[in-house]
């Protein structure tokens, strides 16, 4: 199962942590894994290229780990724009989790200053 937790601080999404493999199908033909990867990777690319936010990123292919969080130096306006991108990914993943509940879990966690705490 893939578990995705979105970080929230002061009602704004500030990042996410995804871990695990969906197990829906063998590697290379797992549509659930492909969907999760596409949504999360698109979010990271949009943050960097559309909003010019140098996100903090940690990824490990073997474990399926991907952690993305906003650096401390982002402005209030950047945080608000990033929140919209994170919420878009969150909504897409929630819909996927409704269709594939045994393969994908999506949660929101708040309060941690450092994404590595998740």
For the regions a protein language model found, what residue spans apply to each?
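N-terminal intrinsically disordered, cationic/polar leader segments
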Residues: 1-31, 41, 45-118
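Short, conserved glycine- and acidic-residue-centered signature motifs
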Residues: 32, 36
